[in-house]
């Protein structure tokens, strides 16, 4: 297949050939000297050529079962050959070896080996980020393991370094799925839409992507939009049967569960019709049968419901929901014994099924067995998905009180209608289910997971584990338990054995029956099933319905995880979606990561990566063992059990072939409960369990336990001993010593350190399961992970990055290949395992910063790799003829264009306005050293003005713009300048423009320093803020009535002589206690546009009295040079507030400064965090599944205190002006009734420009539109402003150089391709242009669709999006807005101005 993306470098291939020849000579010399060596595998020239084009971009497109056996064999041979040579070279080979090894293992779906090889490549290659194929492969591996946080980062970086990457559609698809699981629905929709417009091949069809969009609407409870999207999709031609069945199933269940879709009778009628049609398309869907049963049950058709449930059990026995619903029907039919057995089957399959436990408790209570009822209710409350914990707690308390009042012994003497809960497990149906489940699980372990193409697995002889108890043994166990006090020693021994076997059996079932939480949807995701069961009573005249035994499911063709069907287009197939909300299984700790269940026994050892606060990609705590030991055993004993394929995992390849890795012991990553079956290595995709409030917080705490430790702790057994070095986490220093608790926090960059993952957890201290490499060769495993070396010395790694250039201070006990610096702004240069990085990072703005080397150039390698590129297969980026860095910023434009013709693409095709050589931007690390706790509540810089002269005093401007002052409060400004604030009062606004539009945010009234969930049970970061619209007149009415209501409440309090309690709008002293919910709802009027100088002439004129540096328009304001209106930035916006109105946490657009004046009459409370800590807040947002840039969040002050983040906190009174400096993070709450006005300002400083450009690049990485068009602004600045600051001048000149080069290069490419460029000059005040698809700024050359050009609507695309929608640009015209001569003139005339004379004081 045609390769794409990063081209193969001829020069690299030639060098590799020479290296290969040298290596052969060395081996020959070794043999001649008498060394005995085994014959190593070798590749022919033809094989090397065939392997040349294979890399991660073919993942999902190579089918080994379709004439692919030779390819698979070749890849296997290549892997063996590489491993052999690496072993002989003792790991000292070219870094590209490991990258290729990662690609080959990825294509073979050997994920542990692929990850290890990619990690090794990362550790050796300082500019790894230039290799898009590497980043893509790494992202696929993370995606496979549902490590979504890291997969998202890797995929975003691919698109950043290579926007035209040929697998961009695959990336957008996966990003859409991951953001959906993370409940970031806006981002999810954006990426699904980006995938749809891309015409490149993809493993999913467009119809399947459209299904995801429809399901996204359903997840958001936008049911009418979802219904419309589903119905529209049904009209698609050539729709596959599987997709059609899934859509109909969704529509059927939506009509059953959503009240908005009509009255009950109509809804149920439609629901049944849709489900019946779905079953016509896919008769084997157990889930559709289950839904149909629920519909029949709700309308009283009991017989039909039983038939449907029976069909569901036949198709997929392991469904706790189905068994629970059967129990409800039996209970309604007054058949308690049958109901009991059905409920027991449900909780057997899913120990955390709250609904089944509650129904079982109700059953026992109705049979007057309160002790058993209490046990069931307690189990229900322990479930994470219990929605009525308080009600159950009250019921338990009531029943316990009743028991206390009963005469002693009365319960023992009473005949029981039902067996006790302990005895119920050995009843015939549950016991048979237990036995079958154990047998099936055993069978699964011995069966290839061959589900591609809908093939069923071959019959496998049932084997029952020694611990799989038969019904007879279960009965014997209960008898022994009942007579525990009277047993002889032999019987006690037997009891102990049976109990231990019973525990093992339960744990195994819990691991294997994640399917209890799933239902097949045919595609990826489905609706969340309402776990509350039908409450309608069924007439008692219904005939008794015997509970017959269900057929065995061990027959061929039936799989525990329900049958799956392959989708038409490749690796994603029909999968399963959780019924009801995500559940945990009993005492076995389970975390839904994405939708895969990672089960463990109280240990974190079975998750690939763990972290607490890490914002970037993995980084292990590393223990380097002595090279004399067997490092592969010590290092990998425990850390990565979750990476292994285990029985019943859905990690098999397209034909069910398992990767070459060994199978771990009992713990494995299980992909049950997923929305898409894993074919071609893609992990199962997310389901919708969010609609019931159980959003899959997939890696928010990054622990494998539901209640276990929050990180990995070095136990006594796992503590490094002897010749070891423990590597401290470097990106998030909290002051602990290097050997302190090794919680994996900082996970910067892309990869875990491969040198060791030897952090044992208490439960698995002695485990010897294979780790990352799963290699049969321990020496090779050790080499691939990085050999242990004792010559690690201190060193520095000082680098420049395009975001926050930083310097690392020299520290001991550090390891070079740690990617920690990447999380900050520096680029790591991990050339070898002997090099060192650092423990701390300081911002360029700090007094300790310095710029030592650029991108690692000048770094010495302590390990010289032997040139042994055995395959002549190089996946390096194309050779860099002339680095952009070598082009001076001072030559003329003619020299620049001449140089640009030689530059080529420089290996990249990105449009970063920074240097080519800079890696993708990263959030900054928390400043180091951390502030002491007594410095975390600093005083707010405040200036009191007494008269007009004070306001215009030059040092005021300097004080506000000083980067060391994140915020300044200018008190008494309105009085000093005699501003008429009454012009902005509600009364005046109503009189001026009462029908003017107001955006309204509906919020919850809470204390300013707290943010609780709607129930008031826990503090959260998500801030409820739902958008709607109204008019100034209507909001004014609400504002006034709110004030009147408050007065009335205050008077009532006084009249009742109640003690005055703290107002809800002020801070509370009881911050740690539970708040009573629900909270009162309030409305906040925001973003009221005052840009129209005709409507708001008086108001805008009044603001011209302000000092020049805070005015809306001034020569020294960068935003005044944009040349067009940016609403709310270079125009005024008004805010109308009632107490409790919140402006959630944010930084200003593109990190510009902002001005805010309180009109009054009430106060506002402000919370401010310095710019250098935004990376920490970004981490918290990621941890809480919130989008830092676009989400609504309110920081938890306790979290910030623990993370050593300083918070400025102050009150803004009427007439006070708050200056928010560049990049400052802030959030605001109104204390009283007030109005505010605000706008942005861009001081003409290097700091402001630098931060604006950094955010421009970060926005590009995050697929967020930059409101300020920085390229357009930079050219306007060059035209309009004389710059005397050398730093600011150089940054602007760099931007001009970059864009001049890009315009020229693109121009020449279009002319060479025969594409006509049409002149379309800019008009006055014409806004800057953005791509209508990806929203990046488009400068000079606009790609406009033919249709929009003829209609003069001009729908603009960037070059990359244009090529994705039309490969040869035949559907586009190219419009040119600037003549190259004009740009050259601006560039040449922009020179450094002489410094201004210093102002006299």
UniProtKB/Swiss-Prot annotation:
Escapes X chromosome inactivation. One of its GO terms (molecular function) is identical protein binding. Belongs to the UTX family. Residues 1046-1063 have a biased composition (Basic and acidic residues). Its EC number is 1.14.11.68. It is found in: Nucleus. Zn(2+) binds at residues 1331, 1334, 1358, 1361. This is Lysine-specific demethylase 6A. Residues 1095-1258 form the JmjC domain. Keywords: Chromatin regulator, Dioxygenase, Iron, Metal-binding, Methylation, Nucleus, Oxidoreductase, Phosphoprotein, Repeat, TPR repeat, Zinc. Residues 439-463, 596-745, 795-863, 914-941, 1043-1080 are annotated as: Disordered. TPR repeats lie at residues 95-128, 132-165, 169-203, 207-240, 245-285, 286-319, 321-353, 355-387. It comes from Mus musculus. Residues 918-931 have a biased composition (Pro residues). The modification Phosphoserine is found at residues 769, 829. Residues 439-453, 596-606, 619-642, 660-743, 834-848 have a biased composition (Polar residues). Component of the MLL2/3 complex (also named ASCOM complex), at least composed of KMT2D/MLL2 or KMT2C/MLL3, ASH2L, RBBP5, WDR5, NCOA6, DPY30, KDM6A (or KDM6B), PAXIP1/PTIP, PAGR1 and alpha- and beta-tubulin. Interacts with TLE1. Interacts with SUPT6H. Interacts with SMARCA4. Interacts with PROSER1.
């Amino acid at each position: 297949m045609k390769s794409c993306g990063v081209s193969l470098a001829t020069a690299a291939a030639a060098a590799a050939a020479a290296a290969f020849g040298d290596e052969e000579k060395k081996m020959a010399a070794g043999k001649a000297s008498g060394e005995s060596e085994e014959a190593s595998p070798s590749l022919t020239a033809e094989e090397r050529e065939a392997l040349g084009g294979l890399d991660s971009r073919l993942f999902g497109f190579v089918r080994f079962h379709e004439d692919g056996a030779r390819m698979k064999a070749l890849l296997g041979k290549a892997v063996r050959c590489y491993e052999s040579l690496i072993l002989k070279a003792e790991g000292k080979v070219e870094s590209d070896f490991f990258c290729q090894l990662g690609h080959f293992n990825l294509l073979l779906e050997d994920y542990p080996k692929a990850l290890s090889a990619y990690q090794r490549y990362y550790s050796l290659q300082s500019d790894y980020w230039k290799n898009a194929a590497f980043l893509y492969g790494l992202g696929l591996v993370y995606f496979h393991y549902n490590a979504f946080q890291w997969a998202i980062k890797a995929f975003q970086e691919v698109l950043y370094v290579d926007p035209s990457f040929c697998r961009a559609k695959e990336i957008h698809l996966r990003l859409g799925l991951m953001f959906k699981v993370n409940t970031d629905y806006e981002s999810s929709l954006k990426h699904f839409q980006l995938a749809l417009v891309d015409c490149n091949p993809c493993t999913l069809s467009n119809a399947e992507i459209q299904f995801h969009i429809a399901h996204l609407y359903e997840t958001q409870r936008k049911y009418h939009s979802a219904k419309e999207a589903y119905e529209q999709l049904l009209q698609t031609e050539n729709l596959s049967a599987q997709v059609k069945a899934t859509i109909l199933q969704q529509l059927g269940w939506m009509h059953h569960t959503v009240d908005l879709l009509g009255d009950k009778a109509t809804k149920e009628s439609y629901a049944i019709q849709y489900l019946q049609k779905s079953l016509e398309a896919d008769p084997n869907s157990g889930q559709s049968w289950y839904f149909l049963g629920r519909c029949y049950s709700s309308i009283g058709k009991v017989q039909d419901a039983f038939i449907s449930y029976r069909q569901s059990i036949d198709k997929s026995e392991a469904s706790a929901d189905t068994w629970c619903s059967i129990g409800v029907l039996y209970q309604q039919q007054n058949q308690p014994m049958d109901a009991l057995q059905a409920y027991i089957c449900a909780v057997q399959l899913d120990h955390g099924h709250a609904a089944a436990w509650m129904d079982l408790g109700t059953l026992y209570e109705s049979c007057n067995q309160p002790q058993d009822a209490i046990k069931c209710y307690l189990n229900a409350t322990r479930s994470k998905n219990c929605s009525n914990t308080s009600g159950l707690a009250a019921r338990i308390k009531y029943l316990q009180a009743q028991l206390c009042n009963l005469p002693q012994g009365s319960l023992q003497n009473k005949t029981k209608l039902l067996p006790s809960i302990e005895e119920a497990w050995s009843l015939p149906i549950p016991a048979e289910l237990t036995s079958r489940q154990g047998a099936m699980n055993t069978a699964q372990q011995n069966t290839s997971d061959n589900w591609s193409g809908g093939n069923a697995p071959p019959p496998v002889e049932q084997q029952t584990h020694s611990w799989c108890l038969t019904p007879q043994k279960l009965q014997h166990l209960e008898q022994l338990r009942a007579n525990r006090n009277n047993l002889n020693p032999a019987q006690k021994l037997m009891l102990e054995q049976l109990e231990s076997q019973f525990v093992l059996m339960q744990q195994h079932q819990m691991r294997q029956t994640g399917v209890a939480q799933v239902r097949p949807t045919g595609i990826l995701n489905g609706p969340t099933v309402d776990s509350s069961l039908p409450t309608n009573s069924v007439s008692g005249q219904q005939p008794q319905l015997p509970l017959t035994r269900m057929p065995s499911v061990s027959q061929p063709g039936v799989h525990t995880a329900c049958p799956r069907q392959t989708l038409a287009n490749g690796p994603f197939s029909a999968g399963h979606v959780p019924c009801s909300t995500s559940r945990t299984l009993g005492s076995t700790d389970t975390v839904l990561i994405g939708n895969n269940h990672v089960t463990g026994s109280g240990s974190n050892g079975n998750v690939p990566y763990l972290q607490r606060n890490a914002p970037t990609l993995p980084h292990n705590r590393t223990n380097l063992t002595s090279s004399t030991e067997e490092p592969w055993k010590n290092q990998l004993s425990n850390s990565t059990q979750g990476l292994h394929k285990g029985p019943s995992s859905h990690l098999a390849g397209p034909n069910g072939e398992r990767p070459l890795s060994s199978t771990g012991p009992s713990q494995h990553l299980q992909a049950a409960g997923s929305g898409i079956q894993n074919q071609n290595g893609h992990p199962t995709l997310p389901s919708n369990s969010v609609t019931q409030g159980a959003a899959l917080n997939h890696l928010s705490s990054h622990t494998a336990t539901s209640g276990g430790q929050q990180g990995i702790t070095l136990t006594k057994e796992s503590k490094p001993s002897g010749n070891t070095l423990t590597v401290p986490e470097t990106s998030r220093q909290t002051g602990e010593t290097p050997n302190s608790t090794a919680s994996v926090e900082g996970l910067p960059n892309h990869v875990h350190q491969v040198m060791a993952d030897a952090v044992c957890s208490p439960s698995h201290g002695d485990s010897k399961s294979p780790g990352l490499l799963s290699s049969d060769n321990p020496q090779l495993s050790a080499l691939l992970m990085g050999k242990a070396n004792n010559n690690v010395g201190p060193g520095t790694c000082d680098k420049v990055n395009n975001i926050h250039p930083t310097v690392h201070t020299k520290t001991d006990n550090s390891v070079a290949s740690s990617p920690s610096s990447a999380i900050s702004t520096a680029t790591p240069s991990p050339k070898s395992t002997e090099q060192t990085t650092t423990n701390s990072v300081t911002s360029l703005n700090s007094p300790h910063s310095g710029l030592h080397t650029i991108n690692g150039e000048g770094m010495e390698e302590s390990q010289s790799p032997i040139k042994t590129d055995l395959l002549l297969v190089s996946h390096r980026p194309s050779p860099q003829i002339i680095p952009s860095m070598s082009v001076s910023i001072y030559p003329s434009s003619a020299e620049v264009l001449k140089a640009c013709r030689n530059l080529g693409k420089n290996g990249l095709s990105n449009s970063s306005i920074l240097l080519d050589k800079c890696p993708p931007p990263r959030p900054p690390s928390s400043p180091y050293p951390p502030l002491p706790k007594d410095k975390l509540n600093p005083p707010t810089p405040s200036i009191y003005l007494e008269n007009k002269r004070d306001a215009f005093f030059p040092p005021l401007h300097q004080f506000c713009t000083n980067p060391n002052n994140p915020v300044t409060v200018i008190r008494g400004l309105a009085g000093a300048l005699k501003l008429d604030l009454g012009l902005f009062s509600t009364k005046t606004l109503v009189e001026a423009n009462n029908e003017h539009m107001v955006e309204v945010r509906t919020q919850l009234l809470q204390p300013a320093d707290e943010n609780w969930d709607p129930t008031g049970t826990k503090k959260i970061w998500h801030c409820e803020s739902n958008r709607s619209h109204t008019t100034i007149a209507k909001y004014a009415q609400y504002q006034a009535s709110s004030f009147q209501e408050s007065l009335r409440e205050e008077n009532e309090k006084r009249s009742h002589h109640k003690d005055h309690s703290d107002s809800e709008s002020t801070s509370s002293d009881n911050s740690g206690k539970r708040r009573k919910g629900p909270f009162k709802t309030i409305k906040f009027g925001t973003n009221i546009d005052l840009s129209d100088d005709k409507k708001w002439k008086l108001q805008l004129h009044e603001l011209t009295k302000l000092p020049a540096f805070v005015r809306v328009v001034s020569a020294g304001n960068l935003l005044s040079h944009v040349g067009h209106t940016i609403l709310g930035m270079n125009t005024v916006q008004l805010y109308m507030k009632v107490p409790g109105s919140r402006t959630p946490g944010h930084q200003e657009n593109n990190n510009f400064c902002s001005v805010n004046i309180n009109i009054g009459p009430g106060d506002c409370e402000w919370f401010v965090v310095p710019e250098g800590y935004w990376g920490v807040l970004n981490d918290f947002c990621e941890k809480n599944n919130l989008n830092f840039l676009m989400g609504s969040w309110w920081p938890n002050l306790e979290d910030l205190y623990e993370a050593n983040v300083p918070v400025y906190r102050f009150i803004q009174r009427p007439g006070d002006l708050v200056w928010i400096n560049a990049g400052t993070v802030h959030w605001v709450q109104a204390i009283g009734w007030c109005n505010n006005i605000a706008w942005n300002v861009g001081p003409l400083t290097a700091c402001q420009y630098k931060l604006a450009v950094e955010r421009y690049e970060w926005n590009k990485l995050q697929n967020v539109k930059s409101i300020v068009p920085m390229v357009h602004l930079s050219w306007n600045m060059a035209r309009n402003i004389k710059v005397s600051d050398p730093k600011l001048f150089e940054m602007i000149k760099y931007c001009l150089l970059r864009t001049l080069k890009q315009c020229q290069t693109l121009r020449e490419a279009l002319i060479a391709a025969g594409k006509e460029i049409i002149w379309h000059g800019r008009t006055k005040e014409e806004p800057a242009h953005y791509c209508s698809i990806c929203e990046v700024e488009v400068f000079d050359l606009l790609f406009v669709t033919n249709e929009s050009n003829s209609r003069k609507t001009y729908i603009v695309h960037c070059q990359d999006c244009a090529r994705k929608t039309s490969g040869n640009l035949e559907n586009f015209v190219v419009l040119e807005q600037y003549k190259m001569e004009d740009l050259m003139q601006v560039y040449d005339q922009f020179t450094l101005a002489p410094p201004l004379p210093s102002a006299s004081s």
